[in-house]
Amino acid sequence: MYSTKTDKKWQQKWDQTNIYTFDEKKSSKKLYTLEMFSYPSGSNLHAGHWFNYAPVDSWARMKRMQGYNVFQPMGFDAFGLPAENYAIKTGIHPKDSTEKNIDTMEKQLKSMGAMFNWENEVVTCRPDYYKWNQWLFLQLYKHDLAYRKNAPVNWCPSCNTVLANEQVKEGECERCGTEVTKKDLTQWFFKITDYTEELLKDLDNIDWPEKTKAMQRHWMGKSTGTDVTFKVADSDIKFNVFTTRVDTLFGVTYVVISPENDLVDSVTKEEYKEEIEKYREAAKKQTDIERQSITREKTGVSTGSYAINPINGRKVPIWIGDYVLNTYGTGAVMAVPAHDERDFEFATKYKLPIERVIEGGSSLPYVEYGKMINSDKFNGLYTPEGKEAVTKELENIGLGSGKTNYRLRDWLVSRQRYWGTPIPIIYCKKCGTVPVPESDLPVELPYNVQFSPDGKSPLLKSEEFMNTTCPICGEPAKREADTLDTFVCSSWYYLRYADNKNTEKAFDKDKINKLLPVDMYVGGPEHACMHLLYARFITKALRDMGFLNFDEPFLSLRHQGLILGPDGQKMSKSKGNTISPDDCIQKYGSDVFRMYLMFGFDYAEGGAWNDDGIKSMSKFVDRIERIVGNIKELINSGKNFKNSMDAAEKELNYSRNYSIKSVSEDAGKFQFNTAIARIMEFTNSLYKYIQEDTKNISLLKDTILDFIKIIAPFAPHFAEEQWEVLGQKYSIFNEKWPEFDPKALVKEEVEIAIQINGKIKAKINIPTNLSDEQIKELSISNDNIKPLLEGKNIKKVIVVKGRLVNIVVKP
């Protein structure tokens, strides 16, 4: 009977025979399949890991059997905050805890039975990987795509450290609860904005979920509009606002500038300064994400000054509001509350004027296009023409011009943290900023560093690390103390997998350009606007440097859903609703666990765990095992054989070919739940056939072998065992995936239901080539139906070909 012993038996056999080793010399039908690598946390693999990895492995196994040369590597995204925070809390060094966790997770991943190419493993915290992280930084620096400037960061005055946006919860440090402030620090950036237009355009060329592409488009935020120049009343000060709806310019009733805008000090009246300063301090405690939340109430404070609308000379009040970001556009917006929901909410709260200038809609705010009204000589123009006409007018008077704007900002990559890749830069008093020569890489991360937070980069405390010599002049110099954002590690790891043992280069161009890009990439949708965008940028940058000959890293992308606890809530130790894969595997075996995950949930949606579901799957696997045993006995018995293809044989052959077709199509589209449902139907057909008095053993043998083949990707250990039970040659994964026969899917007979007034009264088998009239006659004359029609008036007979006949009668 199937159990974890079966799993271990075949895992050992696969290891001994190196069955899944990728042959890079076979260039035909290559298939690079990749799941997002995981962070090596201290806990075991959870249900989410399994839901990501196991179904994708099933897809890849099917593709292997279909003749593809599958490359499916695995590794660990091993730098990052969790290990550093854990070290601060426990005193265990990040390197020690991380390597221990990697060892544990490697064993757990191998127990899954996935056909990962472990010989191609990468671990980002090891020098043989982050050496090339540093090389990548140097290439970007060499091509003016890496630069340094001052930038505001989240600062916890209690922990004396910089916090990432995700570490700020409702304006407070998630670790200690202290209110977070903003602080300016000198930071390193990658110039992703040089590629914004191409990143937008090439989304049309990749097979990604539309929602994910829409998220990236929104994040990059391309806007075509107009820069409008406002003058501050009673002064010489001018400022620009960017708008995509310049046709509403006559409806501006106030303007809002960001709290960080340089204008604030110069436009704030004396009597408003105290309130303004309080507001600015409060704004420092909010992250950009929080400030732009659509559910958060908009707030603001008046400066006491007025701006002059350039189109009509009208004075409008100048406010500051934290929902306006200084990093987007000009850090100032014109407010048209009649035609913008955010402006309407703000104006209503602070009792500011609301004036309609676009016709349409029964209520305000009206945000759609329409005819301009209350707009002087522009009245009657429809929005597109109005935009063009007003922009031209502003250009003529020198107070505006057309412009394309983007929300995307350059990627801030420096972190004041220890557990990350050291930035390969040296600072020399004589020579300035000097890149570390490539021959001196890696700049190794020192082990003995005091990294308790005190507001400075931990590496500053290591004199041995910091003190070096300038590679240009040879004088004493200092190293950069910041480390790289861990998203840099994952921005190119898919390239290193294919050439992970190369000690001379990050990767061999010829080798990479044959195997890449990744054909199928799978991971969570939460990475849409960071990792997935950064990887696209790095690919394009390396292409332009001459290292790659392709434009996109991941041709196809799929997202897995979330497995929830039995209570329908997100799994959490504190809620007591977690599911341990290890416990499930020990009880049922990894294939039962794998198949339940694929059958019990839509892969893209996920859902709530159900203990009854995995129990049912265990029973299903046991049932298959019994059927295989019965069929083996039948084949070996030599009794009650026949060679003819009668009705029962045709029905079995139909089920066989229909299942092959359906499973191939459904699993190919990541619809694993319906693929396994088809396998269950196929199982029922097999069981039904072996109850026949006489059997076509040749057909039965071919059918059971095809059955084991199509279940193999979903239950690999179990399928290998049944393949061996049937006396077949190792391994089933060297077998060719079965192909369906279209002729077998053409039925000579079909079962239809006969209804009277919509209620089923009988079922009959009829030839598939009958006309509607012949079907009507057969139905009405059926022995079970005739008595029910006596004394009734048949009004009409409805035929639904291949499904049913409905006889409509009246007394």
Curated annotation (Swiss-Prot):
It catalyses: tRNA(Leu) + L-leucine + ATP = L-leucyl-tRNA(Leu) + AMP + diphosphate. A motif ('HIGH' region) lies at residues 38-49. The lineage of its organism: Bacteria, Bacillati, Bacillota, Clostridia, Eubacteriales. Its main location: cytoplasm. HAMAP family: Leu_tRNA_synth_B. This is Leucine--tRNA ligase. One of its GO terms (biological process) is leucyl-tRNA aminoacylation. Belongs to the class-I aminoacyl-tRNA synthetase family. Keywords: Aminoacyl-tRNA synthetase, ATP-binding, Cytoplasm, Ligase, Nucleotide-binding, Protein biosynthesis. The keyword Ligase applies. It comes from the Bacteria.
